[in-house]
Amino acid sequence: RITRQTLIDCGVDVPFFSANGSDIFKLTNGNLPDVWAGSDFKGDCAGELARMNAYQPQFPRYAAEFWAGCAQQWGGFFSRQSPESVADAYRKALESGIYVNFYMFCGGTNFGFQNGALESTYRVDKPGAPDRYIPYATSYDVDALVSESGQPTEKYYACKRVLAEYLHRPVDDSRITVPAQTTAPIALTETAPLLDQADALSTRTVASALPRTMESMGQAYGFLLYTTTLPHYDDRRYELDLHDVHDRALVFGNGAYLGTAMRDRPGAPIAFRIPPEGIRIDILVENLGRINYGYAMQYDRKGLLGAVRLRIQNPDGSYIWNYALVQNWENRSLPLTDLSALRFSTAPAAPQHPCFFRGAFAAQPGVDTFLDLHSGHKGCAWINGFPLGRYWSVGPQQTLYVPGDLLREQNELIVLELHPDGTPLTVQCIDHPILDSISHTIDLSEESGRA
């Protein structure tokens, strides 16, 4: 009621409606009685019609989200619906007198770091599986009627035929093709190690006893770099315990990669020994995307939310009874909204040391393309200073959409590769997307653990 009244007080004078889950509980508890209640569903038009008639017989029947596909989840399979099944459901909805708003009619892109996330289960998880953090991919193509790049799909033409038949109008079978281009391979010959240039990239550095969250640093997206130094205590084996990592942390000791920790996923211990001169610990935490649906939105802070502790192992394999708390941190904000401070060289990138790569390529201005990054493992890409988004070898997305309006005759490409393998990085722009390539299934636990 407060939300509606605020909109009215601000001069909004259009009809209001709500989008509700396909359950009578959600209809009755997620809406106001005098507000037009739309329903979100796919397929079961008869059941939805009965629920809508029972709840609001005085309003037109409205599919506020008529699902034609689903968003892509990193590490999960691309969920597709066939053109025939969507067109058949659309026909039944029209014949039932249901007004339809396709979700999505046209796919889109979560450029930069703007992808969302869920606290839920993967679509192939078994019933009763625990909820976990699931980030969405950069692409929001969602197998829509019109693709991420504006290309009408077979699903579009199938639904177009259904609508023409329902309206008793002739079917226009003409097709539209959105042009796309392929470039020559792009050699990224210049490098800039991230940890070496963190001070230049940082927008704010704060010293604190315990790690600060991204929000307390006044930062919304990107990365945080936490740094501390541990003196030499003894020669025992130490394990770093990161409590509440949000969302993915790369750990380094004196510049050497020690391991990765991921939110809600078990991993091998991040272990090390402290040399006589001591050890500098750097923890690079990536915000993988903010939860955009459900109660968990309000709790989704980013960074290291809890304490960092040391688990100490004795020579006989036992551990001391309590943990040692790690204090005295430097917290650096790395939103990566401005890369102009980077200083590149032609030195090779060190293996497992996050590094920016830069190269140049020629393209036809105004013509779309898709940046193929399957040669990398995980990172982000910028073309002519514009943040395209993330890539990740776990799939299913392997290309990033590049709108033609971003391109010039000569272009600069910068790629941040979080896990370089020590070899030169070469990528290419191709004329088609790769959005459903996945080499293994849902569990990302292999992404967490010790080097």
Language-model-detected regions and their locations in the chain:
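Active-site neighborhood of glycoside hydrolase catalytic domains
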Residues: 1-32
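Catalytic-core region of carbohydrate-active enzymes that cleave or remodel glycosidic bonds
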Residues: 10, 40-147, 151, 162
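A cross-kingdom feature marking solvent-exposed beta-strand/loop segments within repeated
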Residues: 132-133, 152-155, 211-212, 216, ...
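Catalytic cores of secreted or luminal carbohydrate-active enzymes
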Residues: 148-223, 286, 297-341
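Short beta-strands within extracellular/lumenal beta-sheet-rich domains
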Residues: 220-231, 351-362, 398
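Aromatic-lined ligand-binding clefts that engage carbohydrates, nucleic acids, or primary amines
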Residues: 236-252, 281, 361-384, 391-392, ...
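Glycine/proline-rich low-complexity spacer/linker segments in large multi-domain proteins
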Residues: 286-322, 420-451
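Compositionally biased low-complexity segments at domain edges in trafficked proteins
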Residues: 311-364, 443-451
